[in-house]
Swiss-Prot record:
Entry's EC annotation: 2.1.1.206
Disulfide-bonded cysteines: none
Family, per entry: Belongs to the aTrm56 family.
Name of the featured protein: tRNA (cytidine(56)-2'-O)-methyltransferase
Entry-linked Gene3D superfamilies: 3.40.1280.10
Subcellular location: Cytoplasm
Organism: Haloarcula marismortui (strain ATCC 43049 / DSM 3752 / JCM 8966 / VKM B-1809) (Halobacterium marismortui)
Single GO BP term: tRNA nucleoside ribose methylation
Subunit details: Homodimer.
Length: 180
């Protein structure tokens, strides 16, 4: 988000045939809730295209990249690393420290898909759990980003959209930005 060092979300792993929607939703959630970039495993090319298409239609800025070496990205990242895992420290106990670190350094938020290698736990500055119960990695990412940005992401202004959603009490309304 503006006024702070970059926040990048890394989708660690992607199981074709099993993770299509979940990987897409990790990217869309990262975009909608304040991250600056998502990095997906190369096997997730279609999911990357979907996130790029949404960004083109509904505004940005938001970057999408892919990697064949996600563990190397974690190891070589120049900033702090947060790994979202149900086994981590409770988000409410570490969020202030993570937020403070992100005032000075970029942040890489790692979201797993398949079994996460132990070295990811070791390289993370924080292993963070949202409830320490099994649930969706998309839910964990959403809660974590909301805690990180303290709700500021909900008021974000999107640049250069082709379409704008007009909030309604009932019904749906999507318009050209000039009609808003």
């Amino acid at each position: 988000m503006k006024d702070s060092p970059q926040v990048t979300v890394l989708r660690l792993g992607h199981r074709p045939g099993r993770d299509e929607r979940m990987t897409t939703h990790v990217g869309l959630t990262a975009r909608a809730l304040g991250a600056d970039k998502v990095v997906l495993a190369n096997a997730a090319r279609n999911q990357a295209d979907t996130v790029i298409d949404i960004t083109d239609r509904f505004g940005g800025p938001f970057d999408v990249a892919s990697t064949e070496e996600p563990k190397r990205l974690i190891r070589d990242f120049e900033g702090r690393v947060v790994h979202l895992t149900m086994y981590g420290e409770p988000v409410q106990e570490v969020e202030a420290d993570v937020r403070e670190a992100n005032t000075a350094e970029p942040l890489l938020v790692v979201v797993g898909a398949e079994k996460v290698p132990f070295e990811v736990y070791e390289h993370a500055d924080w292993n963070v759990g949202v409830t320490n119960q099994p649930h969706s990695e998309v839910a964990s990412l959403a809660v974590f980003l909301d805690r990180l940005f303290e709700g500021r992401e909900l008021d974000r202004e999107w640049e250069n959209p082709d379409r704008v959603v007009v909030p309604q009490e009932t019904g749906k309304r999507v318009v050209d930005p000039d009609e808003e």
